[in-house]
């Protein structure tokens, strides 16, 4: 507890202990000067309140020794949302979340939270603020885009609202909010319509696969890695030869490439702990990889001293990791060349999972191969193809009507 006493000049000396880090009491102190003209009892009450605020500021990291601070500067409940986000929240999420997630959370905070609620004290934020935020996002004008008046999807609204909830959760943990009031169960969110996954059916996958025979060894290996093994884009780009065991026919996934705005491309651990995994591949796929490795050796010899050996499987002309956007561009051009409908590169991962399920692979195995944390994520691949649905309808009609 804070202690205080009155000096001869009428000011109060307030002391707070920060513990005994070296076996010796670590005390910090400050001075409270009551306003002139108030009674002794009022001055005593003011000193007591100030002592409580000072103690809270010390334990919450707001107090800076050697620097004069006003009462409102050390009041943990006087902090505005903008100040909390910029001074504290960003630092906390940078050590907890992935760089790409941090970038997204910051963009939502800067674009929406700070302009709308930045001047509100953290202690005054209520579920009504979150509800108004959700309602605004769900309205037609929330995109800040005159050319697109359509409202954000329900899933996107909830994703943005999660950032607001995250801010208040951290504020509660740090003592700036008395309680975590943004409980999701009391917020009315717009209806979320889950889009059906986009994947190639059997015939389209066969056209895709056969078309790869005409491509360069690197393009063939890159797209087959997505189609046959279901790796995420960042996992493909971050793959190294040391991760591959040709004798065992296995590949260890332990890193992912990423790129945030204004920063160079880098590597990080995969999306979740479940994403650190070993996947197995066929001899046919191994032959494709080995063919590419032979060509990569030739490229290295040709580049000479310009070659920057880092051990990446997929490289540019001087041995560096390829740009993370390149696989997406390669996939798009290849689909157009084959006359296939456009799928994002991630659609090859969906195709891989859907074909596994359709061909009898149990869902737990697919979950393990794909590195999903939750079985519900894997269950999206249980969605039948239109052709399978048509056969089911025909079979039922034949059974009843014949």
List the model feature ranges, each with a label.
Residues 139, 210, 248, 259-276, ...:
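C-terminal secondary-structure termini that scaffold catalytic or DNA-interacting sites
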Residues 191, 199, 256-259, 363, ...:
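Catalytic-site neighborhood detector that most strongly recognizes the C-terminal catalytic loop/helix
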């Amino acid at each position: 507890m804070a202690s205080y006493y009155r000096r001869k000049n009428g000011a109060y000396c307030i002391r707070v202990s920060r513990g005994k880090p070296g076996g010796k009491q670590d005390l910090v102190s400050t001075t409270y000067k009551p306003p002139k003209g108030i009674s002794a009892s009022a001055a005593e009450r003011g000193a007591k309140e100030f002592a409580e605020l000072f103690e809270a500021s010390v334990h919450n990291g707001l107090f800076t020794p050697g620097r004069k601070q006003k009462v409102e500067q050390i009041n943990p409940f006087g902090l505005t949302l903008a100040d909390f986000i910029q001074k504290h929240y960003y630092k906390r999420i940078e050590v907890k979340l992935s760089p790409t997630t941090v970038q997204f959370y910051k963009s939502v905070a800067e674009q929406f939270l700070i302009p709308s609620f930045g001047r509100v004290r953290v202690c005054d934020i209520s579920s009504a603020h979150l509800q108004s935020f959700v309602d605004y996002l769900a309205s037609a004008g929330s995109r800040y885009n005159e050319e697109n008046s359509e409202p954000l999807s329900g899933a996107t609204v909830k994703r943005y609202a999660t950032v607001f909830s995250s801010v208040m959760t951290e504020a509660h943990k740090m003592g700036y909010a008395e309680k975590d009031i943004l409980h999701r169960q009391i917020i009315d969110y717009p209806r979320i319509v889950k889009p059906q996954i986009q994947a190639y059916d059997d015939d389209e996958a066969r056209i895709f696969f056969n078309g790869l025979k005409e491509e360069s060894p690197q393009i063939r290996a890159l797209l087959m890695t997505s189609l046959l093994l279901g790796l995420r884009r960042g996992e493909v780009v971050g793959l190294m030869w040391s991760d591959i065991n040709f004798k065992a026919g296995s590949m260890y996934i332990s890193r992912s490439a990423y790129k945030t705005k204004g920063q160079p491309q880098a590597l990080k651990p995969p999306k979740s702990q479940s994403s650190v995994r070993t996947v197995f591949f066929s001899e046919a796929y191994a032959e494709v990889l080995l063919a590419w490795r032979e060509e990569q050796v030739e490229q290295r010899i040709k580049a000479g001293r310009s070659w920057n050996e880092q051990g990446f499987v997929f490289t540019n002309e001087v041995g560096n990791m390829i740009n993370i956007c390149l696989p997406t561009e390669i996939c798009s051009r290849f689909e157009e060349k084959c006359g296939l409908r456009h799928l994002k590169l991630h659609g090859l991962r969906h195709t891989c999972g859907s074909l596994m399920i359709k061909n009898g692979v149990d869902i737990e195995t697919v979950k393990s191969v794909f590195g999903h944390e939750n079985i519900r994520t894997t269950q999206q691949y249980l969605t039948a193809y239109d052709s399978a649905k048509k056969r089911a309808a025909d079979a039922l009609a034949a059974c009843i009507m014949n």
